[in-house]
Amino acid sequence: MILRRSVILALGLTPLLTRKVFSQTAVKARHVGLLSSGAPFTDASDIVVGLKAGFSMRGYVVGSSLLIERRAAEAYLDRLPELVDDLKSEAELIITNSYAAARVVKDHANIPVVAITGADPVATGLIVSLAHPGGNITGVGEVAAELSAKRLEVFKDAFPNLRKIAMLWNADDLGMTMRYKSAEAAAIRP
């Protein structure tokens, strides 16, 4: 008797359950692009780990409701426009890790950009001002040029007899060039 009631109940509920299941709309996956001007982002990269953790706290599941596309120029900055074009076809947001990448995304894509740079975003022209950045870009910058000069001053104080210091930088990266010029000016000061 119990088996018969269970079968009848199951058959009676089947149309209701299937209608409910089939009427659910699929959740659209969100696409985030990561653009590196240097080495590729790996799953162990701080930015990838942080993104996954942050999005998962908001209910996104990487691989289904959140897709992260990664591109890297591997120091070939002339490849950045091509990589941006590739990312912007799918991504709703692009996150960059350098001034060079942020500049190219800003100039070539009309989607939101989060720039994590070691350069002053106002001095490099990425944004108009900190209060009103304008455009499609936001992010984190730093006063690295001033810090470079201060670091050199501390170094000179620690080693007063030192006469030569070498500094490596990428002349194609305005942020790095600004840091170099600031350090160079500090080196000349007595």
What label would you give each PLM region?
Residues 1-190:
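Short hydrophobic alpha-helices and adjacent helix-cap/hinge residues
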